Amino acid sequence: GHLLPMQIIFLRVLGTFVIAWGIQVSIKELRILKIERADYPRLILSSLLGVAINQMMFFTGLNHTTPVDAAIINSVNPILVLVFAAWILKERIGISRLGGILLGAAGALMLILLGNPLSLEGGNLTGDMYIIVNTASWSLYLVVSKPLMVKYNPIMMMRWMFLIGFIAVFPFSVEQALEIDFSSFDSFTWFSILYIIIGTTFMAYFFITYSLKRLSSSVVAYYTYIQPVLVA
């Protein structure tokens, strides 16, 4: 039941699109919603940053680095979002907000490093670079997509983002996806796949999309610091 990174990406992106599409077409109020042509460029960019690049860089990076290195690099996410939001959306960087994010970063790093000794092995450099691109891509996504999330329905946004994201990851993942032997999957493997698609992808993206409609990008990113607490 072992799956390669690109196989997981193929299944989770396609599965999430199917769920979002199914919900939208089954509800009349959502079925009639459209995205304005002027928003197409931002939609495409958001899809590439938040789905395609984010997913491929993260899983590829984990194959070449340690979870500790990945967690440390990801802890920079709220800081990058704060910078991008100030630059692109002209959000004000207040002293209290900056201080809170830096304090959260320090706390997250303490939890990560206390539970796992830091290893600065040269062999992790390639993987670390992938994770850096992943973190920068996700941070930029939270800022670039914000105007769309405020304007449109979350389910409709997810439908289109994951459709575009699937088109983008398809050339890189289809070869491995065709090699998946579904007949070898036991019940635990099927449960794991469904959990990845529904729990850690569809629900996670839905709540983030919903939150961006009501909160600033930097506040949404700030909740990244809850992850080390939950893991610990």
What are these regions (language model features)?
Residues 1-3, 8-11, 15, 56-65, ...:
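Juxtamembrane C-cap of transmembrane helices in multi-pass membrane transport proteins
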Residues 5-6, 17-20, 81-83, 119-177, ...:
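Transmembrane alpha-helical segments that form core, pore/gating elements
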Residues 25-69, 73-74, 110, 197-215:
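Specific transmembrane alpha-helical segments of multi-pass solute transporters/efflux pumps
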